[in-house]
Design a protein with these regions (language model features):
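Residue-level detector of flexible, active-site-proximal loop/helix-junction positions
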Residues: 99-101, 127-129, 194-197, 210, ...
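An accessory alpha-helical subdomain
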Residues: 243, 247-269
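Short amphipathic, helix-prone segments within low-complexity/disordered or flexible regions
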Residues: 2-12, 17, 28
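Catalytic subdomain that performs nucleotidyl-dependent activation
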Residues: 92, 172-250
Length: 276
């Protein structure tokens, strides 16, 4: 095993994966190079979601799933901002699972998280090779998602995190709702806050009131180091989700209050199973 230095006051541990597959840790200064303040509207929406669904509590240790995309990077900065200004204390770390697919390269996240003073865990797994052996092509994305989630759960347990934060937004929930209704015959969507099956981790989605166009605008205006999605499975075929995205975009052209109405529709569904 690789020994890790003890935590020191004013320091956090940046965890990265080396070629042997073992972790090593580097103490880095907790003081970030600079703070990026997210837009007030995003802060207000996320703050409201956190309150409405009781997502983050005093003393929580939160592990953020960081893909390097615009949504997870936006949520990183929002939670980072709340760490400094919220009336409660919570700890924040981030994790990237590299599925070893296409040209995906999360290495820019390492110095970036270091500059923010955020503890970072990076793990590399041949998920695409596993999917090719065990799944049909249309199932790659769901298989990858399940494996990544399992890796995040095990990492959270190992490092004593009790909350996992995911970056799905209102557009994602609306698309999931239509997919479930059209293809599954059920009225359901992603939950805003729930407990995993083992009962030891809470999973939260603080962006459930926010739109995708907001995270895109924030990431572009702030020049966040977005890593393009380069998974070949995601681009080799049209997906049900992409079809729903296009359907919603067409409908929103005709109905500008579409997502306001959808949020009213979805709120009881996303509230199911909310922990007290």
């Amino acid at each position: 095993m690789v020994s890790t230095p003890a935590r020191m006051p004013g320091f956090v541990i940046l965890t990265t994966l080396i070629s042997t597959g073992l972790f090593h840790s580097i103490p880095v200064s907790f003081r970030p190079m600079s703070f990026i303040k997210p837009p007030k509207t995003l802060l207000r929406q996320v703050g409201r979601a956190i309150i409405d669904f009781n997502m983050i509590r005093e003393g929580d240790r939160v592990l953020l799933g960081l893909s390097g995309g615009k949504d997870s990077l936006s949520l990183l900065h929002i939670l980072h901002h709340f760490q400094r200004h919220a009336p409660i204390h919570f700890e924040l770390a981030a994790m990237t699972v590299d599925p070893m697919a296409g040209d995906f390269d999360p290495s820019p996240m390492i110095p970036y998280l270091k500059s923010l003073g955020v503890e970072y865990h990076y793990r590399k797994e041949p998920i695409m090779d596993m999917a090719k052996k065990h799944m049909g092509k249309p199932s790659y994305c769901s298989f990858c998602s399940r494996i990544k989630r399992g890796i995040m759960y095990s990492t959270a347990r190992e490092h004593k995190f009790n909350v996992i934060a995911l970056a799905q937004h209102l557009d994602d929930l609306a698309e999931s709702f239509l997919m479930s209704a059209f293809h599954g015959g059920k009225l359901k969507t992603m939950k805003a806050h729930y407990i995993n099956d083992d009962g030891d981790l809470r999973i939260i989605r603080p962006l459930v009131y926010a739109r995708e166009r907001q995270t895109r605008a924030f990431s572009e205006a702030s020049e966040l180091p977005v890593i393009p999605d380069s998974c070949p499975a995601c681009f080799s075929m049209p997906t049900q989700r992409q079809h729903m995205k296009e359907l919603l975009a067409d409908e929103e052209q005709l109905n500008k209050t579409l997502f306001k109405s959808l949020l009213t529709t979805l709120k009881p569904l996303m509230s199911e199973g909310k922990p007290e």
